[in-house]
From Swiss-Prot:
GO biological-process terms attached to the record: heme O biosynthetic process
Catalytic activity entry: heme b + (2E,6E)-farnesyl diphosphate + H2O = Fe(II)-heme o + diphosphate
Documented EC number(s): 2.5.1.141
Gene Ontology MF terms: protoheme IX farnesyltransferase activity
Protein family: Belongs to the UbiA prenyltransferase family. Protoheme IX farnesyltransferase subfamily.
Designated name of the protein: Protoheme IX farnesyltransferase
CDD domains, sorted: PT_UbiA_Cox10
Membrane spanning residue stretches: 2-21, 30-50, 83-103, 105-125, 131-151, 160-180, 206-226, 229-249, 260-280
GO CC terms of this entry: plasma membrane
Chain segments annotated as coiled-coil in the UniProt record: none
Subcellular location: Cell inner membrane
Enzyme class: transferase
NCBIfam families per record: cyoE_ctaB
Length: 280
C-alpha cells in the first residue's frame, strides 16, 4: 500500500507537469528519465523496508503479545534479532544515497526524515503517549510526497496535499484497529486512544478526521491537479466513508463497526488514488 501511494504520487505529478506545458518540445524537456523514476521506486522500497525491519526489531517483544503481530518472523523465531537489525540498517543505509544521488536532494532528505522519525521517535512513543499516532502518521504520509518530489524536485501545494490526505487517512484507519484490538494493545502495554479516553471519544475522533479527509480530498480540483471525474468520485467515496463513520456514533455498533471502518478505509484509499490517477 505504501509503495502504491508513492507510485500514485509519481504518476499524478507527471500528468500535472505535462498538463501545464505547451508543445511537444517543452514536454520532452520536462520529462523525467525512466532511470531516475526506477531509482526513486527502488529507494522508496529500500527505505520503507529498512524502517519496517528496524521497527520490528525494536518491538519484537511487544509483537509477541499481540495476535496481529505474533506471526511476524522475529516473535515467531523464524529470524534472529541480530540478522533483522543488520538487515534493517543495511537497507536504510543504502536507501538514502540512492535517492539523494539518483533522484534529487529533496526526495533524499524527505526519505531520511521519514526513516529517522519513524524509527527513533514514533516507535518509542507508542509505549508512552497516544500522540504517537499523529506523530507516526507524519512519516507514514511521506511516500506519496516522495513520488511527487521524485518528478518535480520540490514540495509545492499539490505535493503537500498528497501528504495531507495520506496523513488524515491514517488516523481513522489506525483508530479503528485500536478499537477492535484494544485488549491486545493493553496486554502489550501500548498507549491507544480507546484505552486512555474511551470508545466514544475514539469514535468522535474518527468522524472528525474523516470530515477533514473528505474536505482535503476535493482540493485537488481547485489546485488544477484533477478534474470533474475525480471530483465526483471523491465526493461519492468520501460521502460513503463519512456516513459509515457517523453511523459509529450510535450506541451498540461495537467492534463490528470498527472492523467495517478498517476495511472501508483500505477500499477508500485505493479507489481515491485510482480516481486521482485517472482524473489527473
Amino acid at each position: 500500500m505504501v509503495v502504491a501511494t508513492m507510485l500514485g504520487g509519481m504518476w499524478v505529478a507527471s500528468r500535472y507537469l505535462r498538463a501545464g506545458l505547451a508543445g511537444d518540445a517543452a514536454i520532452e524537456r520536462a520529462a523525467v528519465p525512466p532511470a531516475q523514476l526506477a531509482l526513486a521506486l527502488l529507494g522508496t522500497v529500500l527505505v520503507v523496508s529498512g524502517a519496517n525491519a528496524l521497527n520490528m526489531y525494536i518491538e519484537r517483544d511487544t509483537d509477541l503479545l499481540m495476535e496481529r503481530t505474533r506471526s511476524r518472523p522475529l516473535p515467531a523465531r523464524r529470524l534472529s534479532p541480530e540478522l533483522a537489525l543488520w538487515f534493517g540498517i543495511a537497507l536504510s543505509a543504502a536507501s538514502i544515497p540512492v535517492l539523494l544521488v539518483g533522484v534529487n536532494a529533496t526526495t533524499g532528505v524527505l526519505a531520511a526524515a521519514a526513516l529517522l522519525s519513524y524509527v527513533l521517535v514514533y516507535t518509542p512513543l507508542k509505549r508512552r503517549t497516544t500522540l504517537s499516532l499523529p506523530i507516526g502518521a507524519i512519516p507514514g504520509a511521506i511516500p506519496p510526497l516522495l513520488g511527487w518530489t521524485s518528478v518535480t524536485g520540490q514540495i509545492d501545494a499539490p505535493g503537500f496535499l498528497l501528504f495531507a490526505v495520506m496523513f488524515l487517512w491514517q488516523i481513522p484507519h489506525f483508530l479503528a484497529i485500536s478499537l477492535f484490538r484494544q485488549d491486545e494493545y493493553q496486554r502489550a502495554g501500548l498507549k491507544v486512544l480507546p484505552l486512555e479516553k474511551g470508545d466514544l471519544t475514539t469514535r468522535r475522533h474518527i468522524v472528525g478526521y474523516l470530515a477533514l479527509l473528505v474536505l482535503s480530498s476535493v482540493l485537488f480540483v481547485p489546485l488544477g491537479v484533477a478534474g470533474p471525474v475525480y471530483l465526483g468520485a471523491a465526493i461519492l467515496l468520501g460521502g460513503a466513508f463519512f456516513g459509515l463513520g457517523v453511523y459509529g456514533l450510535r450506541a451498540g455498533t461495537g467492534a463490528r463497526w470498527a472492523r467495517q471502518v478498517f476495511f472501508a478505509s483500505m477500499v477508500y484509499l485505493v479507489l481515491l488514488f485510482a480516481a486521482l490517477m485517472i482524473g489527473a
